[in-house]
């Protein structure tokens, strides 16, 4: 099992290219199930979750080509993948595939829309909370689906096809919004979704579906109106830059000091994050090619800032762990409140192993900033927690070994290579 070794204390200097957003690529790939024609997606990152979803889609009969070449067995190393679901060969999504990634459950929407039936295992993924699929299932019922759950599988049927309806999400859910949009685009009649997620990744999906012939209005807002169409066409869409990756590297620069350009990062997707990082003392300049970051830790100390996670455009839960790592070296006390997931502080114990001083009280972590962190062996517990340990290790004295980095490979493309090119002492160890 791979691990990553880091010797801290080096400033970061250079250019970090920001990859396509995994959280945007996954629903776009699943949308290929909605059309017989080819959906071409540019800027897809090379990640374990992408590879897994390719296998899942292939299980349903979706062919794919990388820059015009078929590849049914290996993870791709290219920016463009062409997906063609000319015929859905099965509506069955088995446990051995779906259990590895929660987003794979989203195939239930397109399968119901196109085949009027889906038999999908309940999902897996990072163990950071229950993330119930109840909102998705209740929403699909509103569109006319008959749903039963048996032996860990959801069996959904709609013999006469889905019908437009009005549905209000009890709580903002990105995954639920993705599924309901994809289910409703070819439903008979009008669907109105209230309290919908308005993350940039949702907007990316809406724009893609409209390019395929859907009729969706309200993009970027919490109310989406969908006029069902009979069929969707193929299209070519670019995956948006990964705002979570960009925010992660911005926090790394804030932690170590240095001078880094985040190439292709979209600052409009990170408005609150950048404002908060400026309050910590990071110098940020928006340029045509991306986001330019500077920090001289001898001149500007890391200032403590309180944050509370929330649905977009609030501070993203996917950057909470990374920001906590930054706050471990702040000149004072900060408070971090998590409102999205109920179990997303598993990184606290590992950060404390590096010398951090963090105390938990329910959904709030109090971080007592310390001048120095000390390298030590630590264990990644989930995707975002794992990268928070990397950020802390970059500033810690001595060597840190981050174990179970397969979590990192699910969401960060060539992380150690990007950091090493900016001067970090970091390497992957394969046992």
Curated annotation (Swiss-Prot):
Top-level EC class: transferase
Q: Which residues act catalytically here?
A: 126 (proton donor)
Top-rank taxon, per record: Bacteria
Chief site of localization? cytoplasm
Q: Keyword annotations for this protein?
A: Cell cycle, Cell division, Cell shape, Cell wall biogenesis/degradation, Cytoplasm, Peptidoglycan synthesis, Pyruvate, Transferase
- Molecular function GO labels: UDP-N-acetylglucosamine 1-carboxyvinyltransferase activity
Q: Name the EC number(s).
A: 2.5.1.7
Mark the residues carrying the PTM 2-(S-cysteinyl)pyruvic acid O-phosphothioketal: 126
Per the record, the pathway is:
Cell wall biogenesis; peptidoglycan biosynthesis
Q: List, in alphabetical order, the GO biological process terms annotated in this UniProt record.
A: cell division; cell wall organization; peptidoglycan biosynthetic process; regulation of cell shape; UDP-N-acetylgalactosamine biosynthetic process
Protein's cellular compartments: Cytoplasm
Family annotation (Pfam families): EPSP_synthase
The entry's family comment says:
Belongs to the EPSP synthase family. MurA subfamily.
Q: What is this protein called?
A: UDP-N-acetylglucosamine 1-carboxyvinyltransferase
Q: Which organism is it from?
A: Bartonella henselae (strain ATCC 49882 / DSM 28221 / CCUG 30454 / Houston 1) (Rochalimaea henselae)
